[in-house]
């Protein structure tokens, strides 16, 4: 190899010879005193390196922003490097743009995280606009709702591909009964004794006691003394709500009076929700009751519990002090336990109608973490445990529905739900327990969601049919006095199960049994049970009429059932069915019923004379 030395300039020999040199004792010549003894073209390299670079025999470059070399910084080890001015100048000269060109590790990680968030957001937008993956963008949970289990549930979007049982039932009622119109408010709870339909003090006391016995526990009202005198004023929302709910147990109250109370409550709610926060505690109690029983008077448009609970939750976050602290920082005393019970009611109602309407769920995880704390209180009840268990169940349902890959697998059993069943199995027993109804309802929704991706799955269709029969069979065993105080969500669960039976097996005897049970259960024609009974009967009649008129379009032309008519049982396939009264399930005894408050028959026009508009008009695609 030829070495190029063109750029190296040496001084003239004459000058070189006249340089003074140091001579060692052994005669060897040492370096001259002057720097000119070194050739000017040689690169001036730093002879100082840290211990690591010297050991690895690698280049040691100092980071201008720190006191360590780049290799030690990247390896995250201590850099044993003497701090010298020459060293810093050498590195700075060789890396003049190091500050701007090579960021630190923390800056790199921050940049990568930002890019990942942007990419994730773009992917979600793409999935939202893709019909095949639309239900991948539904709420995530427990840590909040989005596709990943550790993502946030805040502002979770809804999906048009999810079943909407509550919306479906409300649409069917509007179709069968017509749109309701709001009437002017005329309060019967007036201090004026001459007012039309006014409730006197003796009757109001009876209503309050009935309310305490059947409804008060869910908002920590166990005695009449828990309702203070200022809460018993005619303009008190809690007082009006208590009288409204208790009226179903007092058949002597005229329907017009109950209707007027309902209108006044609606009017008061509209005004209160716009009041400056924080709201009074008794007002929050009344709002929680109305979230649980929004459809008290069915002649009026029902209050939207999803919207009502959402606004009430915002007021509760401001009014309830314990929500301002971490769960571990809160001592669960009697007052906090009552507030936790109220908060859990709001969370559960928001979940009920977020799932039932396929709407977003907005409660942040840090607020949801407070829900199980009520079980730490020594006076916690089984009902408190049921509410906590149901909150967890609906959160899991939202998470599973939002996971399109899990829905495509079309599992009949989900590991999360099986764990939940083992944890809360002790709450399934008991005549008044409705936890199993919620479990079967959530399983039905998961199977219905999976059927959108597996439209011809016989396994899923069979599972929906079986689960719907379990719901109705269990509901028919509930006693009359208990059934009247059930929250409206239970009636939506039972109504949806009955519609599923009409969809899969029109000849199932449970359809007529639950229809009659709802009819005899209702204290008046405004009660939700009465309207649901009429709805099931009319839905079944239209299904049967449409199939008889056009057998070829039985299910194939229905947007509801895209899995074909093979799931339907014909008259020839149906097993022998005993008469209705002989086939009643044990526990459904007519001695429980109150003849004086039973409507004698369906109103004219509900079941007769209504035109059959075709299967697609009333069998909603969202069932």
Swiss-Prot record:
Q: Is Transmembrane among this UniProt entry's keywords?
A: no
- GO cellular-component term (any): nucleus
Looking up PROSITE patterns in the UniProt record yields: ZN2_CY6_FUNGAL_1 (PS00463), ZN2_CY6_FUNGAL_2 (PS50048)
Q: InterPro entries annotated for this entry?
A: prtT, Zn2-C6_fun-type_DNA-bd_sf, Zn2Cys6_DnaBD
Q: Does the keyword RNA-binding apply?
A: no
Q: Where in the cell is it found?
A: Nucleus
Organism expressing this protein natively: Aspergillus niger (strain ATCC MYA-4892 / CBS 513.88 / FGSC A1513)
Q: Which UniProt keywords apply?
A: DNA-binding, Metal-binding, Nucleus, Transcription, Transcription regulation, Zinc
* Alphabetical GO biological process terms: positive regulation of DNA-templated transcription; regulation of protein catabolic process
Q: Where is this protein chiefly located?
A: nucleus
| PANTHER family linked | FINGER DOMAIN PROTEIN, PUTATIVE-RELATED, TRANSCRIPTIONAL ACTIVATOR OF PROTEASES PRTT
Entry function: Transcription factor required for protein utilization and degradation. Regulates transcription of major secreted proteases.
Q: What is this protein called?
A: Transcriptional activator of proteases prtT
- Domain of life where this protein originates: Eukaryota
- DNA-binding residues per UniProt? 50-79
Q: Which GO terms describe its molecular function?
A: DNA-binding transcription factor activity, RNA polymerase II-specific; transcription cis-regulatory region binding; zinc ion binding
**So what family is this one in?**
Belongs to the prtT family.
| Signal peptide (from-to) | none
């Amino acid at each position: 190899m030829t070495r190029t030395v063109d750029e190296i300039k040496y001084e003239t020999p004459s000058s070189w010879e006249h340089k003074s040199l140091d001579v060692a004792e052994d005669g060897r010549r040492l370096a001259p005193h002057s720097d000119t003894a070194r050739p000017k073209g040689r690169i001036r390299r730093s002879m100082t390196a840290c211990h690591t670079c010297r050991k690895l025999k690698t280049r040691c470059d100092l980071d201008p922003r720190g006191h360590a070399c780049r290799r030690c910084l990247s390896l995250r080890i201590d850099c044993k490097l003497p701090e010298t001015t020459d060293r810093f100048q050498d590195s700075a000269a060789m890396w003049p743009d190091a500050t701007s060109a090579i960021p630190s590790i923390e800056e790199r990680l921050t940049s990568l995280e930002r890019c990942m968030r942007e990419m994730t957001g773009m992917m979600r937008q793409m999935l939202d606009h893709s019909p095949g993956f639309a239900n991948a963008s539904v709420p995530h949970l427990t840590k909040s709702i989005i596709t990943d289990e550790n993502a946030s549930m805040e502002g979770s979007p809804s999906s048009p591909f999810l079943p909407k049982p509550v919306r479906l039932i409300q649409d069917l009622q509007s179709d069968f009964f017509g749109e309701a119109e709001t009437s002017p408010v005329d309060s019967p709870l007036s201090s004026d004794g001459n007012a039309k339909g006014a409730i006197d003090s003796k009757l109001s006391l009876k209503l309050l006691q009935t309310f305490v016995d059947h409804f008060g526990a869910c908002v920590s009202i166990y005695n009449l003394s828990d309702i203070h005198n200022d809460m018993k004023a005619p303009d008190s929302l809690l007082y009006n709500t208590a009288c409204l709910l208790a009226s179903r147990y007092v058949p002597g109250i005229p329907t017009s009076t109950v209707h007027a109370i309902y209108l006044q409550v609606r009017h008061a709610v509209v005004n209160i929700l716009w009041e400056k926060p924080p709201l009074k505690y008794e007002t929050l109690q009344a709002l929680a009751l109305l979230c649980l029983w929004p459809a008290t008077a069915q002649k009026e448009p029902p209050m939207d519990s999803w919207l009502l609970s959402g606004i009430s939750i915002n007021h509760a976050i401001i009014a309830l002090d314990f929500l301002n602290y971490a769960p571990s920082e809160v001592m669960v005393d009697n007052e906090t336990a009552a507030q936790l019970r109220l908060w859990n009611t709001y969370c559960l109602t928001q979940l009920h109608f977020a799932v039932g309407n396929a709407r977003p769920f907005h409660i942040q995880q840090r607020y949801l973490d407070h829900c199980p704390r009520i079980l730490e209180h020594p006076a916690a009840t089984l009902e408190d445990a049921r509410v906590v268990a149901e909150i967890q169940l609906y959160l899991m349902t939202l998470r599973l529905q939002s996971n399109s890959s899990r829905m495509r697998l079309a599992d009949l059993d989900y590991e999360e739900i099986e764990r939940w069943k083992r944890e809360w199995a002790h709450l399934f027993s008991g005549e008044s327990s409705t936890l199993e109804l919620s479990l079967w309802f959530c399983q039905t929704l998961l199977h219905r969601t999976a059927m959108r991706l597996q439209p011809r799955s016989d396994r899923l269709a069979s599972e929906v049919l079986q689960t719907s029969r379990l719901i109705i069979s269990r509901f028919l065993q509930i006693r009359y006095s208990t059934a009247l105080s059930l929250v409206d969500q239970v009636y939506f669960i039972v109504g949806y199960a009955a519609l599923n039976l009409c969809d899969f097996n029109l000849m199932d005897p449970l359809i007529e049994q639950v229809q009659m049970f709802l009819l005899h259960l209702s204290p008046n024609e405004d009660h939700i049970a009465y309207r649901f009974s009429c709805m099931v009967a009319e839905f079944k009649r239209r299904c049967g009429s449409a199939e008889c008129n056009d057998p070829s379009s039985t299910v194939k032309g229905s947007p509801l059932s895209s899995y074909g008519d093979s799931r339907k049982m014909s008259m020839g396939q149906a097993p022998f069915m005993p008469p209705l009264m002989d086939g009643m399930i044990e526990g459904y005894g007519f001695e429980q019923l109150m003849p004086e408050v039973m409507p004698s028959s369906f109103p004219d026009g509900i079941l007769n004379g209504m035109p059959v508009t075709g299967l697609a008009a009333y069998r909603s695609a969202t069932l």
